[in-house]
């Protein structure tokens, strides 16, 4: 399983592969945020679109999901994309809001912070992503973030431990008090990766929780400090 957030192309790409053909059987569904009001609809034969607004401030947003399978079958019904007996499946996700960065707003204007139409931007991003395909998206993502990521290297232990041990097992051992320098290196670089993927010139800086938590209103209101 591979996942990356492609800033350059404004799309999240998730690829599932198995070591044997025809073994990908899974269902993709989107769980709406509990403090929003919206509706789910089919978006083409292999896609879903969720159009909604937040209940507290009315901010509009759209989430699109599109599936691409090699082998097997795809079905799209009741707000779910079901994949059966595929060799490989890629899910593409685009999302946007109508929020506009405005450093000098007219507070009497109810549209002071309203910008793009998210239905249009997410459609354009999705069409571009589908046309490029996973391999092109991955290369562009890698080239984009690696230019920043590869500026720093951290090696805490010259006798590097095996990198093949699953992260879940590493965390389990670490909680039991077993030292793992590789895990500490991994967490350091993972934090850098998230920051690189969440804050770039021209956008808002990363807030207290970053953009990767699962709440509309995170702890401490996700303020900027």
Q: Which residue ranges define each predicted feature?
A:
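Aromatic-residue-lined binding/catalytic grooves and analogous aromatic/hydrophobic interfacial grooves
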Residues: 1-4, 8-224
């Amino acid at each position: 399983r591979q996942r990356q957030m492609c800033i350059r192309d404004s799309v999240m790409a998730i690829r599932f592969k198995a070591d044997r053909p025809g073994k990908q059987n899974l269902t993709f569904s989107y769980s709406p945020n509990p403090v929003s009001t919206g509706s789910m609809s089919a978006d083409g034969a292999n896609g879903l679109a969720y159009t909604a607004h937040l209940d507290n401030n009315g901010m509009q947003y759209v989430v699109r999901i599109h599936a691409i399978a090699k082998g097997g079958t795809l079905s799209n019904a009741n707000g779910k994309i079901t994949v059966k007996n595929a060799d490989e499946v890629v899910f593409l996700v685009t999302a946007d809001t109508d929020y506009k960065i405005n450093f000098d707003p007219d507070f009497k204007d109810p549209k002071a912070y309203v910008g793009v139409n998210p239905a249009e931007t997410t459609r354009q991003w999705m069409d571009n992503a589908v046309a490029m395909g996973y391999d092109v998206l991955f290369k562009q993502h890698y080239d984009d973030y690696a230019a920043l990521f590869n500026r720093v290297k951290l090696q805490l232990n010259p006798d590097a431990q095996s990198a093949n041990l699953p992260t879940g097992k590493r965390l389990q051992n670490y909680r039991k008090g077993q030292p793992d320098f590789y895990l500490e290196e991994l967490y350091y670089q993972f934090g850098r990766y998230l920051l690189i993927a969440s804050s770039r010139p021209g956008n808002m800086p990363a807030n207290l929780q970053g953009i990767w938590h699962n709440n509309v209103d995170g702890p401490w209101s996700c303020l900027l400090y």
